[in-house]
């Protein structure tokens, strides 16, 4: 629900596109790439797995990005969760269940191994990270800092509440992305 909260927080200031992404990572990256080509956004914002995808897109599209609690090692998250799962946010297609299996984990492993291959130093100050101080799932701030300089914190957990999105995420987007337009 962070995407919906961001759309609401920036209403009248920016159009926030909140797509349902495909489950399989290569399909999701193709979908995002096509969406960027069609919509021509001014910035990318993602949370968790969405941050994993956004940071892989940045070198190709040269957009600034805000990565919320980026989960750079999705395989670590997925392995103990093999089986049927539920999406946290309602999906437009109504399908709330998905399956985590070894094939899906292998697909993420392939991308993880190459996720920083296209990184270049010009991105150091164009990609922002925001990390929940109570996040018990993703602890990738040190890895983020190996590549990027802009780091922020908020007091919440891995999935920010709507209030945390309004109070912490939206101001970063407004100050750093909208004012540059």
PLM feature segments, named:
Residues 13, 41, 62, 124-126:
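A general structural motif
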